[in-house]
Amino acid sequence: MATYKVTLISEAEGINETIDCDDDTYILDAAEEAGLDLPYSCRAGACSTCAGKITSGSIDQSDQSFLDDDQIEAGYVLTCVAYPTSDCTIQTHQEEGLY
């Protein structure tokens, strides 16, 4: 099992934290364990409440069913069903940017 550094950033929410996240742990779960309060609703990858935007690194969000190919190509990620596959940086609180 690998552990990656995941940096979560939201200027509006005053968040700029780097957390450790195992490659078999969802990023949202790791953030909560680290004491961060990120938005979520379904926790199943079927809505956009937890949406973020990846700015560096890579993730696996193959469990998600909400984002379309264009949104994924643009870097959007559902943190509730995303595993890190490298060190990465994600802008949180990006739901409004999807629409």
UniProtKB/Swiss-Prot annotation:
Keywords: 2Fe-2S, Electron transport, Iron, Iron-sulfur, Metal-binding, Transport
Cofactor or coenzyme needed: [2Fe-2S] cluster
Domain 2Fe-2S ferredoxin-type stretches: 4-96
Gene Ontology biological process terms from the UniProt entry: electron transport chain
One matching Pfam family: Fer2
PROSITE patterns, per database record: 2FE2S_FER_1, 2FE2S_FER_2
Listed InterPro entries: 2Fe-2S_ferredoxin-like_sf, 2Fe-2S_ferredoxin-type, 2Fe2S_fd_BS, Beta-grasp_dom_sf, Fd_pln
The name this protein goes by in its record: Ferredoxin
UniProt xrefs under NCBIfam families: fdx_plant
GO molecular function: 2 iron, 2 sulfur cluster binding; electron transfer activity; metal ion binding
Gene3D superfamilies: 3.10.20.30
Function: Ferredoxins are iron-sulfur proteins that transfer electrons in a wide variety of metabolic reactions.
Cofactor note: Binds 1 [2Fe-2S] cluster.
Domain of life according to the entry: Bacteria
Family: Belongs to the 2Fe2S plant-type ferredoxin family.
UniProt-annotated binding residues for [2Fe-2S] cluster: 42, 47, 50, 80
